[in-house]
């Protein structure tokens, strides 16, 4: 369900391969989510831990659909989300 005026944070575990992060961020872009912050730690054992916070009020799709599309990105291992 679309939350008016809310900020969502998505924590993702990615394979440390070229293009995975940009493909993940493209999903946010295509959904018209306004990205506020991106944090990524140095990859460990081939896995990168990324946190993305975005405003969700103007998204063109529901949050559940966004999460589904993020998980479909090749190289995404795990996703957790917090809608605040």
Describe each model-derived feature in a short phrase.
Residues 1-84:
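A conserved regulatory-domain signal marking ACT and ACT-like small-molecule sensing domains
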């Amino acid at each position: 369900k679309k939350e008016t005026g809310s900020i969502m944070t998505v924590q993702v575990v990615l394979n440390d391969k070229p293009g995975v992060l940009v493909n993940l961020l493209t999903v946010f872009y295509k959904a018209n989510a306004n990205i506020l912050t991106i944090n990524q730690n140095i990859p460990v054992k081939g896995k990168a831990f990324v946190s993305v916070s975005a405003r969700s009020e103007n998204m063109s799709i529901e949050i559940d659909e966004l999460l589904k599309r993020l998980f479909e990105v090749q190289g995404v291992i795990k996703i957790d989300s917090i809608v605040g």
